[in-house]
Amino acid sequence: MAMVQPKSQKWRLLATHLLMFTFIAMILFPLLMVITISLRPGNFATGSLIPENISWEHWKLALGYSVVSPDGRVTPPPFPVMLWLWNSVKVAFITAVGIVTLSTTCAYAFARMHFRGKSTLLKGMLIFQMFPAVLSLVALYALFDRLGEYVPFIGLNTHGGVIFAYLGGIALHVWTIKGYFETIDGSLEEAAALDGATPWQAFRMVLLPLSVPILAVVFILSFIGVITEVPVASLLLRDVNNYTLAVGMQQYLNPQNYLWGDFAAAAVLSALPITIVFLVAQRWLVSGLTAGGVKG
């Protein structure tokens, strides 16, 4: 026997689908516009959503190849986009690994150990994290200018300095991982201790394998945050060859010459590392959500 839905429920279902499709369109439209601009001849930001003529000149320049026009004029790549992309991936990956490592060990101490001032430290970390990084730019510049005199590889205009600056923003990740650790039954580590495991072995062989989903989330959030970060990187990096892609892309928007097509191609390239990392870590994210739903 077929079920008959009330008319009011049908309208609610229709409204839900309309809102969902509208939301998806709002997300996809800017992406389609950027892709269209990258495939449109010339460096124009306006035009039809579907280009009449498709040109690969902007993609060739972004990938480091020269473009030869019909009149024989050779246009070399204006900027080292692929080098910037490599710098972004390198800095983001090292930073994300460092953040996961530091956050995990700190979160373990706060979740499993008892010491004086723990609550004050946790609250203090959270309060300091609430202040935007822009407020500390002057202090960061002075700090890394002085550090560079003693330790050159973490001074100004170095990727080490940028990574070191990013590693300071772990407070929210510590809170996130700490909360996840507290949902794991401590009796598992106690059982490992009865079998002769040291606290470090229990942490490494019991707690960490059970925490892979949240570690994947922290890694992805850290990776995306570094890939898209501009203020700190633009302050500390001076040499064009040391730029990350997010910083270097500003060179396309010179007031005398806006290279919108080249900018759009570089913007699409900047999304590739984020997409790849998300696809690789997707199974851990899904398993984490599923496990959370089962455990309640």
UniProtKB/Swiss-Prot annotation:
Keywords noted in UniProt: Cell inner membrane, Cell membrane, Membrane, Sugar transport, Transmembrane, Transmembrane helix, Transport
Give a GO biological-process term. Answer: maltodextrin transmembrane transport
Residues in ABC transmembrane type-1 domain copies: 85-281
An example of a GO molecular function for this protein is:
ABC-type maltose transporter activity
Q: Which residues cross the membrane?
A: 13-35, 89-111, 124-143, 153-175, 206-228, 258-280
Q: Does the keyword Ligase apply?
A: no
Predominant location: membrane
- Which InterPro entries is this protein grouped with? BP-dep_ABC_trans_perm, MetI-like, MetI-like_sf
The UniProt entry lists membrane topology as: Multi-pass membrane protein
GO-annotated cellular components: plasma membrane
The listed locations are: Cell inner membrane
Q: Which residues lie on this side of the membrane: Cytoplasmic?
A: 1-12, 112-123, 176-205, 281-296
Q: Which residues lie on this side of the membrane: Periplasmic?
A: 36-88, 144-152, 229-257
Q: What is this protein for, i.e. what is its function? A: Part of the ABC transporter complex MalEFGK involved in maltose/maltodextrin import. Probably responsible for the translocation of the substrate across the membrane.
Q: How does it assemble?
A: The complex is composed of two ATP-binding proteins (MalK), two transmembrane proteins (MalG and MalF) and a solute-binding protein (MalE).
Per the similarity annotation, which family is this? Belongs to the binding-protein-dependent transport system permease family. MalFG subfamily.
Query: What is the protein's given name?
Result: Maltose/maltodextrin transport system permease protein MalG
Q: Which organism is it from?
A: Photorhabdus laumondii subsp. laumondii (strain DSM 15139 / CIP 105565 / TT01)
